[in-house]
A protein has these predicted regions:
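Glycosyltransferase catalytic domains, chiefly GT-A lineage
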Residues: 1-243
Length: 243
């Protein structure tokens, strides 16, 4: 659907086979973990690789596999507004919040907070965590530095992206969100443009038709729907998938 939307100059789909061999060798132990194909450690690598190969001022929209693009009139208008927000500002990042109740300190380890010198009583720790499944990046010196800082986290302590510290946390902690925790804190440190959750509409389906990016990948579907999707994959790929 992304290709048919006319929203993009280019649409790229990537998989494990597209990762650089040096990256694979460096993080082989983490990548062997089934969760997120290695705690989603690959995500920053593919975005950074794409960012390096576009012109300054160009914009990348990263979406997790399974996301759907809505091309209804109001959604198209909103999509253009996303780009205008970036192009009309000096900011290189546009991000979306998760659901309001999901606070940073509930889904980020103390060790990661300490790395960034962020206290649990700060506004960042008590703010809503940002999504890592839908992110806009405009190429600039600032956005390239963002990914250098991401790599520095991993070089300092690879366990900051894993579940290694899950038993050393305060009572409010629920679980580490791995790549999302790092992307979220860096997004706030870099003063991203932050919008409320405009991608997940499972509990407010009546609103989804006005927004362009739908993170429907986590929806529950029965066997009948899965069989339909397998049989008519080429057709469904050209249709917006709603919640």
């Amino acid at each position: 659907m992304a290709k048919e939307s006319s929203f993009f100059d280019k649409v790229i789909s990537l998989g494990p086979e597209d990762l650089d061999k040096d990256f694979l060798n460096k993080y082989i132990d983490v990548l062997s973990n089934k969760r997120g194909g290695g705690y989603w450690i690959w995500k920053h690598e593919i975005i950074n690789s794409l960012l390096k190969n576009i012109d300054n001022g160009d914009i990348i929209l990263y979406c997790d596999a399974g996301s759907s693009i809505n091309t209804l009139p109001k959604a198209k208008k909103r999509f253009k507004e996303y780009f205008d927000l970036l192009l009309d500002s000096k900011n290189s990042f546009l991000r979306f919040e998760t659901e309001k109740q999901f606070l940073e300190k509930q889904f980020t380890s103390n060790e990661l907070f300490k790395y960034f010198d962020i206290g649990l009583d700060t506004s960042i720790a008590n703010s809503t965590q940002l999504q890592a499944g839908v992110m806009f990046f405009q190429k600039s010196y600032e956005s390239l530095e963002f990914f250098n800082d991401y790599k520095n986290v991993l070089d300092f302590d690879i366990n900051l992206i894993t579940d290694s510290y899950r038993n050393n946390q305060d009572n409010q902690f629920i679980e580490n969100r791995h790549d999302q925790s790092i992307f979220s804190l860096l997004g706030k440190i870099y003063d991203s443009i932050v919008l409320e959750n405009e991608t997940e509409f499972r509990n407010r389906k009546e609103l989804q038709y006005d927004y362009p990016i739908l993170t429907v990948r986590a929806s529950n579907h029965g066997l009948k729907d899965k069989v339909k999707l397998m049989l008519f994959k080429s057709i469904y790929a050209k249709k917006t998938k709603f919640f």
